[in-house]
């Protein structure tokens, strides 16, 4: 039986209040080494992969909440490609949307190095960190080049792990995950195959403050949210009158609202008209995002947004197979760039994401009072955006235009 490589893609996404400390982790000078054009090219390719993966999830889990981190999944798969060769490597990068004729492998790998470095660069009032950890079996002999690449290019932590003791290995990995997510994710890995010899963990941690925080006293404790034509649930509904970038896309029959975080990140709420969700999902692409970015206009909005928490866990194995990554799971997998040992193949790719949207995120934080003089007198003249039915949500990092998180909220009461 072939030894297994286990890929874990862990995401912790939080909307919280202001956090002034700089993110932990190594800071490197990455902003001058990569042309902006390359980053924008990569962000477009990554966005199209994100929407392709999203559409797979809608087929596999229809009428369910969807939430995941595209940049986390892409970065982990590119890191895995460091150790892959021949068709195994080609399938991985082509599934991500790259054409090796147009974009050589070295450009892809260095592009992601710069992307991760840019995302990890400390930003006051925004805590954003993407990281990797590699747990390698004590008897596996990884190639020096592979270890050097993942350490220097991706700042990956590497641990020597005794996988002959499954219980101890799970404890070691879960303890590391719990520590990196500040205790938010406990017991991520419940089982490991007996012949597992390597586990790759990728995580992204995000905390930010709304640029225009909501006043908790204006949150309605119970408001109707439409799940389908006949079913509603009750959710807390936040409310404010504020200026936001927004638009009505007449072609796609949806309303788009941009809510900025205080520093270098933004959230896009996409609210289709009733019965139009599938057509909007089918049209989502990097070109759609660029169109909206051009057309968004700032103006006063009477805004109602649900307060909610959702999480999602995915076994990406079957999904990645359908998308084109097949050799990595087969007996013919070629990971000779990782080790000289024969027979290594990918056994599983797991992904977990968690999100909380609220007025302030932590009880200790204060929300500024809303000055009445800053609001328009004739509120009835301004559009009402009431997010009270299924919607899509995107969270993007501004400087790289990377989609940090992507999802659909069908039922905000299903945590």
From Swiss-Prot:
Residues binding thyroxine, per UniProt: 293, 398
Effect of residue 383 to L: Kumamoto; partial thyroxine-binding globulin deficiency
GO molecular function: serine-type endopeptidase inhibitor activity
Glycan attachment points: 36, 99, 116, 165, 253
Tissue: Expressed by the liver and secreted in plasma.
PROSITE patterns: SERPIN (PS00284)
Regions crossing the membrane: none
Pfam families for the chain: Serpin
InterPro entries (alphabetical): Serpin_CS (IPR023795), Serpin_dom (IPR023796), Serpin_fam (IPR000215), Serpin_sf (IPR036186), Serpin_sf_1 (IPR042178), Serpin_sf_2 (IPR042185)
Family: Belongs to the serpin family.
The protein's name in its UniProt record: Thyroxine-binding globulin
Originating organism: Homo sapiens (Human)
């Amino acid at each position: 039986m072939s030894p297994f490589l286990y890929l874990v893609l862990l995401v912790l996404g939080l909307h919280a209040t202001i956090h002034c400390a700089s993110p932990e982790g190594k800071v490197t000078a990455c902003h001058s080494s990569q042309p902006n054009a390359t980053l924008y090219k990569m962000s477009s390719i990554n966005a199209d992969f994100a929407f392709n993966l999203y559409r797979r999830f809608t087929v596999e889990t229809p009428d369910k909440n969807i939430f995941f981190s595209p940049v986390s999944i892409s970065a982990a798969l590119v890191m895995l490609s460091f150790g892959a060769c021949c068709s195994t490597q080609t399938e991985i990068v082509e599934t991500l949307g790259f054409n090796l004729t147009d974009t050589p492998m070295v450009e892809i790998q260095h592009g992601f190095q710069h992307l991760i470095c840019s995302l990890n660069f400390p930003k006051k009032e925004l805590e954003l960190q993407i990281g990797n950890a590699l747990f390698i079996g004590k008897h596996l002999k990884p190639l020096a080049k592979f270890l050097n690449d993942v350490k220097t290019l991706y700042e990956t932590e590497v641990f020597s792990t005794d996988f002959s003791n499954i219980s101890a290995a799970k404890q070691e990995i879960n303890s590391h995950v719990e520590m990196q997510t500040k205790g938010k994710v406990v017991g991520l890995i419940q089982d490991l195959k007996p012949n597992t010899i390597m586990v790759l963990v990728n995580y992204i941690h995000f905390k930010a403050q709304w640029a225009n925080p909501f006043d908790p006293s204006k949150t309605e404790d119970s408001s109707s949210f439409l799940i389908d034509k006949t079913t509603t649930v009750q959710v807390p509904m936040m409310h404010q009158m504020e200026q936001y970038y927004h638009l009505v896309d007449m072609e796609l029959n949806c309303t788009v609202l941009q809510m900025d975080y205080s520093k270098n990140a933004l959230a896009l709420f996409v609210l289709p008209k009733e019965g139009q969700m599938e057509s909007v999902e089918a049209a989502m692409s990097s070109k759609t995002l660029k169109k909206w970015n051009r057309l968004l206009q700032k103006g006063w909005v009477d805004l109602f947004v649900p307060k909610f928490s959702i999480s999602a866990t995915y076994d990406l194995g079957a999904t990645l197979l359908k998308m084109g990554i097949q050799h990595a799971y087969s007996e013919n997998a070629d990971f000779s760039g990782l080790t000289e040992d024969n027979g290594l193949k990918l056994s599983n790719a797991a992904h977990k994401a968690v999100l909380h949207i609220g007025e302030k995120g932590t009880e200790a934080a204060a929300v500024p009072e809303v000055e009445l003089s800053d609001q328009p007198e004739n509120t009835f003249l301004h559009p009402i955006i009431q997010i009270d039915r299924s919607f899509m949500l995107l969270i993007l990092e501004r400087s790289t235009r990377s989609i940090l998180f992507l999802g659909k909220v069908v039922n905000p009461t299903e945590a």
